[in-house]
Amino acid sequence: MRVRGMQRNWQHLGKWGLLFLGTLIICNAAENLWVTVYYGVPVWKEATTTLFCASDAKSYEKEAHNVWATHACVPTDPNPQEVVLENVTERFNMWENNMVEQMHTDIISLWDQSLKPCVKLTPLCVTLDCRNIATNGTNDTIAINDTLKEDPEAIQNCSFNTTTEIRDKQLKVHALFYKLDIVQINKDDNRTYRLINCDASTITQACPKVSWDPIPIHYCAPAGYAILKCNEKNFTGTGSCKNVSTVQCTHGIKPVVSTQLLLNGSLAEGEIVIRSQNISDNAKTIIVHLNESVQINCTRPNNNTRKRISLGPGRVFYTTGEIIGDIRKAHCNVSGTQWRNTLAKVKAKLGSYFPNATIKFNSSSGGDLEITRHNFNCMGEFFYCNTDELFNDTKFNDTGFNGTITLPCRIKQIVNMWQEVGRAMYANPIAGNITCNSNITGLLLTRDGGLNSTNETFRPGGGNMKDNWRSELYKYKVVEIEPLGVAPTKAKRQVVKRERRAVGLGALFLGFLGAAGSTMGAASITLTVQARQLLSGIVQQQSNLLRAIEAQQHLLQLTVWGIKQLQARVLAVERYLKDQQLLGLWGCSGKLICTTNVPWNSSWSNKSLEEIWGNMTWMEWEKEVSNYSKEIYRLIEDSQNQQEKNEQELLALDKWASLWNWFDITQWLWYIKIFIMIVGGLIGLRIVFTVLSIVNRVRKGYSPLSFQTHIPSPREPDRPEGIEEGGGEQGKDRSVRLVTGFLALAWDDLRNLCLFSYRHLRDFILIAARIVDRGLKRGWEALKYLGNLTQYWGQELKNSAISLLNATAIAVAEWTDRVIEALQRAGRAILNIPRRIRQGLERALL
């Protein structure tokens, strides 16, 4: 009886099972992402670092004792690089810019350092017997404007006792002092005075050779850092900037110390720009950036002489000897037309911030002389000019006013130090006339408070020198380059290798940041070009700094610039070594792209690879994963440490040196675990395919048979049916019983799978062996053919060489024989000459 049922085709089942398993493994592997390290990516973050200076001091001032000490700076780059960063938006804040703080500290240090070796004027804190100065001028034909005539009491001729070179001897001397520099001791006696600062501060005399003319200073970032520059024309100093570039150094900034008016600065490229931390807060200073400069010409017309007074051994006091001619006030002249037009534009610009109010200007509301007057230094003299005429609304409402505005000025020699309370400086008088021409490029204003909403009154202000530096540094910020980046890729570090320690590379901050606006995929293509620039940039910058430092070796001490250059050198090397150390710890030394075996965690970022590499820039990606950078770095380092341990164990062969390791229980537990996993997987596959097969056959109309049902099994045609006693043909099929029980089922599946794998592996090995055998035979035949061919051509070349040598030898022999024969004939002819002569004589005698 024939039993019909399901017939299991183990061969096809094994093929489909392996195909499904391979597909599952491939799909699972395709979904895994791994951390990859990139070196040279255009990423930065805001930072605070030590800046150094660059200047062309020698082209401006030949005096080596310039107070700004810019001779110690690095020479400026004749071809400065500026790289525009496409598709980059960066936030700036001029009110929280460390560059301002650093410049302020530097200028204070320069002032202090210029005064350190100079004379203390403590011996001058004595009683002064003063009278109004008497001029020795003549009746000039040129009339002097009454407004420019100096008050007779403005300059006092004072006498006092001082110590000579011999300490126990005193000498009575006289000197000229401005009335602003002395104070009356006794109210009842208008002839006894003292220096104004003797009761409150120490007085230091400026060195006689010091020059006060500001020289442009370029602030530069050390290697590993960059300076970002905002190029928007109407940028207010705060907020986002879409036109960003990166530079190595700032433009030349003149450190002009002044109040109320900003002198000799840069101009706005577009319209007049108003900058304030909070313009609605009347306590905040308003910086007005002009787009057109207004010339201001200042002069001290008096022809002064300077003399020396000894204050004892090693101390010399410089004072005004006499004034030749009529005494006239120092003053400044400003073009009325230019100033009126400028003030009208400033009013209109301020009106845009206060649309419902009338803008008015007024003079300073009071305070120290440095605030109420326009204070600045002109050729070494400190001017204090009255600017009431500049901010007179009534005068400038008259459109017909086109004259020259004259600002009366006073000069002080004892100046309060702007950088520190309780200190004063005595400025040496300058001989001769003094004239300086400057450009007004900005204003420092304050707004009146109160509840008056119809009028907004603005007054000149200043006094905080940081605002002067902000007016020039508003468009810059310092950032630290982060050339190390991590991102997910499909590449994984497969094997542990002992890596060769190659020379590291790095990233310069100009051309290197040019790819900042590109996508991550586009930027990663140029990693080699970007990374090659850092080390060369560091070396070049270090060389420039070293030359500048060597130029100062003849000095007893370094200036503030020299110290900054040393700091910049150390900082650049430290910054570079820090990155190289991380790369070394991660096993990525000398590599621009370094794969790892750290799996990418979707909690760090669940974006797809296409979205990351096709749409995001490195800056955007860095912000995305910045919170997880430390964790990723730690995992990479731990992974590398584990790899190095594994490498050490493999190289030492500690676990395989002895056969007894095979009997270690931990090893066997590991083997058993793997075996259980394999068996479990096979059983799972068996169940899945059985269910699928049953479902498929049920859909075709079959009913599932019991596992105890015998199914027909085809017999091979060359095998007789039955046993010896039961001969005859009983059909081509026979019934077999399905296996029963879980273990039998598992054993049967495992046995069939092993047989299937064995047969296919055997066939594959036979085919591979046959292919290799044929390949070896053909290779051997090809080698023999090449050997015969080489032997043939070698013999041919040998024969050709022999023939060539024979022909050459024959030709040389023939040529040699002819030469020898010719020489022999010539020799015989010479030898026969006497005999021919004798024969001729004999014939003649006969």
Curated annotation (Swiss-Prot):
Residues 158-198 are annotated as: V2. Residues 564-582 are annotated as: Immunosuppression. Disulfide bonds join 53-73, 118-207, 125-198, 130-158, 220-249, 230-241, 298-332, 378-436, 385-409, 588-594. Residues 652-673 are annotated as: MPER. A motif (YXXL motif) lies at residues 702-705. Residues 130-157 are annotated as: V1. Residues 385-409 are annotated as: V4. This is Envelope glycoprotein gp160. It comes from Human immunodeficiency virus type 1 group M subtype F1 (isolate 93BR020). The gene is env.
